[in-house]
Amino acid sequence: MNQEAAFRHLLLMLQLVMLPAVTPVREVVLGKAGDAVELPCQTSQKKNIHFNWRDSSMVQILGNQGSFWTVGSSRLKHRVESKKNLWDQGSFPLVIKDLEVADSGIYFCDTDKRQEVELLVFNLTAKWDSGSSSGSSNIRLLQGQQLTLTLENPSGSSPSVQWKGPGNKSKHGGQNLSLSWPELQDGGTWTCIISQSQKTVEFNINVLVLAFQKVSNTFYAREGDQVEFSFPLSFEDENLVGELRWQAQGASSSLLWISFTLENRKLSMKEAHAPLKLQMKESLPLRFTLPQVLSRYAGSGILTLNLAKGTLYQEVNLVVMRANSSQNNLTCEVLGPTSPELTLSLNLKEQAAKVSKQQKLVWVVDPEGGTWQCLLSDKDKVLLASSLNVSSPVVIKSWPKFLAITLGGILGLLLLIGLCVFCCVKCWRRRRQAERMSQIKRLLSEKKTCQCSHRIQKTCSLI
C-alpha cells in the first residue's frame, strides 16, 4: 500500500515536471481603443471544426455550430464576430470591434487544443486649454494653448513608449507628452509608438495650430504709393470676427481702421475708416489695400481675430519713406517703427554713399546735380528706395542772373516792338495827312480851272 502511494506520488511529480513543456504558448496582440482587433486561432487541420472562444473567466464569447457562429453571454456579445471564409482553412479568428482598454486580458480558443491570446488595448487622450479628445486623430487648438498627450495602458503592462513630432523629430515624454506653448511649427502629425513583447502599435494624431503664418509683420511703402497688408493664416474653414485698430506715430490713442467677418471662407467688410479708402478682397488670404500712403499713417496696429476657440492677435507695423529736395537741401526720412539695425542712406546713383547713417533722417546741403537715391536697407537687402533728380549747382547759382538777363531781354524786345509800332503808326498818319493835302490841292486846282473857263465863255458872249 505504501509502495502504491509512493508510485502515485512519483507519477504526480513527473506530471508537474513535464507541465511547462506542454503549456500552450501565449500570443500577444496589441490594439488601439476605438479600433477593431483580430485574435488568431489556428489549427493544424485545414478544415472547419468546432471551436469556442472564452474570456479569462471562462465565459463563452463566440463559438460555432456547423457553418454558423453563436454568441455567448459575455459583455462583448454586441461587439464580436468571426471570419467564416477562413474556417475551412482551419483559422477561427475572434474579431472585437470598438475596443476599450477594459477589453485587455487573456482569451482562450478551444479547438483540438487550447490556445491562449493576450490582448493589450491602449488609448491616447489629448487635453488642451479649450477642450479634450479621446481617440480622435484630429486636434485643433490656438497658438499658445497648452497641449498634453497621455497614453493609457492596461494594468500590469510595461510598454516602451516613443514620441515623434513633425519632421520625424523624437521627443522623450514617457507616458505623457506636454507642449506648453505650441507654435505654428508644432502643427502636423504626432506619432506615439508603443512596443510590448516584440509587438508594436502606433497612434497618429494630426495637430493643427490655429495661428498667423510666419511672415514679416512690418510693411514698407513710399509716401504716395499703394501698400497691401497681407496676413496668411494656417486655416481657412474657421468662422471668425476681426478688426484692425491703428495707432499712428505720436498719437495718444488708436483708431479703428476696419472690421470684418469670415464665414464659410468668405470675407465681408463690416466697417471701415472712410478717409483711408481701405479695400478688402472677399477670399483668403486676408488682405487689406491702402490706395495711397501718407506720412501720417506711419505707426503700429493690432489685428484681432475672434474665433470660437479663442482670440488671436497680430502686431502690424507700417514704415513710410518721405524724400524732398529744395534749392539747397536734399532730405530723406523714414517714419514709423524701425529696427536700429536698419541703415538709411543717400547717394548719387551708381556712386558711393554720400551720407549713410543708422538714423531716421539724412540730408545733404548743396547736393551735386544728378539722380540721388534714398535707400532703407537691412544689411545687403534694400527695403525701400526713392529717387530724386537734382539740377546742376552751376545752373542753380546762375539762375538769378539768367533770369534777370532773360527778363531784361524780354523787356527790351517789348520796348523795341512798341517803338516800331509807334513809328509805323506815325509814318502811316503822316502819309495819310500828305495824301489828304494832295487831294485838297488837286480839288482846289480843278476848281480854279473850272472858274477861269466859265469867265472866258462869258466874255466872248458879250462881244
Curated annotation (Swiss-Prot):
Integral membrane glycoprotein that plays an essential role in the immune response and serves multiple functions in responses against both external and internal offenses. In T-cells, functions primarily as a coreceptor for MHC class II molecule:peptide complex. The antigens presented by class II peptides are derived from extracellular proteins while class I peptides are derived from cytosolic proteins. Interacts simultaneously with the T-cell receptor (TCR) and the MHC class II presented by antigen presenting cells (APCs). CDD domains: CD4_CD. The gene is CD4. GO terms for biological process: adaptive immune response; cell adhesion; cellular response to granulocyte macrophage colony-stimulating factor stimulus; interleukin-15-mediated signaling pathway; macrophage differentiation; maintenance of protein location in cell; positive regulation of canonical NF-kappaB signal transduction; positive regulation of DNA-templated transcription. Gene3D superfamilies: Immunoglobulins, transmembrane domain of human cd4. Residues 25-401 are extracellular. GO terms for cellular component: external side of plasma membrane; membrane raft. The Ig-like V-type domain mediates the interaction with MHCII. Forms disulfide-linked homodimers at the cell surface. Interacts with LCK. Interacts with PTK2/FAK1. Binds to P4HB/PDI. Interacts with IL16; this interaction induces a CD4-dependent signaling in lymphocytes. Interacts (via Ig-like V-type domain) with MHCII alpha chain (via alpha-2 domain) and beta chain (via beta-2 domain); this interaction increases the affinity of TCR for peptide-MHCII. CD4 oligomerization via Ig-like C2-type 2 and 3 domains appears to be required for stable binding to MHCII and adhesion between T cells and APCs. The chain crosses the membrane at residues 402-423. The modification Phosphoserine is found at S438, S445, S461. Residues 424-463 are cytoplasmic. Disulfide bonds join C41-C109, C332-C374. The keyword Cytoplasm does not apply. A lipid is attached at C424, C427 (S-palmitoyl cysteine). Residues 125-211, 212-321, 322-378 form the Ig-like C2-type domain. It is a single-pass type I membrane protein. Glycans are attached at N123, N168, N176, N324, N329, N389. It holds the Pfam family Tcell_CD4_C. It comes from Canis lupus familiaris. Palmitoylation and association with LCK contribute to the enrichment of CD4 in lipid rafts. Phosphorylated by PKC; phosphorylation plays an important role for CD4 internalization. The keyword Phosphoprotein applies. It is found in: Cell membrane. SUPFAM superfamilies: Immunoglobulin. Residues 1-24 form the signal peptide. This is T-cell surface glycoprotein CD4. Expressed in macrophages and a subset of T lymphocytes.
